[in-house]
Amino acid sequence: MRRVYTNRRAHHEYELLERFEAGISLTGSEVKSVRAGGVDFRDAFARINGSDVDLEGLYIPVYKEATYNNHEPRRKRRLLLHREEIEKLRRGLEQKGLTLVPTRLYQKGRYFKVELALARGKKLHDKRRADAERTVARELREL
């Protein structure tokens, strides 16, 4: 694994329950742009459409060196999962309050992979408690 992009906001906004690895279908200009850097997870989420899983809202900047055949920066991108994994995700999403959030984008061999997580949104008091626990742990390490 070489270049890794993480969704740091997902760890703050959500309680991550279960993780899945999925391939992602990218065009040539998207691959070059990801290698150049600048991926943004800010509004990214995954949705199950029939037998497919789509990643929406992931921002991959336009590749500067590409010609007229460049990609749309926030287009839907298809995720590649086994049928059993899709059914497991579908059963998980049927539970109230769960959503599918991308947590990492990385290169594994020649291919780019996305790590998805079934997640439950945190309330404000949960975020504050997590911040307080991190602060206490940091102070204990410093002693």
From Swiss-Prot:
This is SsrA-binding protein. InterPro entries: SmpB, SsrA-bd_prot, SsrA-bd_prot_CS. NCBIfam families: PRK05422.1, smpB. It comes from the Bacteria. Required for rescue of stalled ribosomes mediated by trans-translation. Binds to transfer-messenger RNA (tmRNA), required for stable association of tmRNA with ribosomes. tmRNA and SmpB together mimic tRNA shape, replacing the anticodon stem-loop with SmpB. tmRNA is encoded by the ssrA gene; the 2 termini fold to resemble tRNA(Ala) and it encodes a 'tag peptide', a short internal open reading frame. During trans-translation Ala-aminoacylated tmRNA acts like a tRNA, entering the A-site of stalled ribosomes, displacing the stalled mRNA. It is found in: Cytoplasm. Its main location: cytoplasm. Belongs to the SmpB family. PANTHER family: SSRA-BINDING PROTEIN, TMRNA-BINDING COMPONENT OF TRANS-TRANSLATION TAGGING COMPLEX. GO terms for molecular function: RNA binding. One of its GO terms (cellular component) is cytosol. One of its GO terms (biological process) is trans-translation. HAMAP family: SmpB. It comes from Deinococcus radiodurans (strain ATCC 13939 / DSM 20539 / JCM 16871 / CCUG 27074 / LMG 4051 / NBRC 15346 / NCIMB 9279 / VKM B-1422 / R1). Keywords: Cytoplasm, RNA-binding. Pfam families: SmpB.
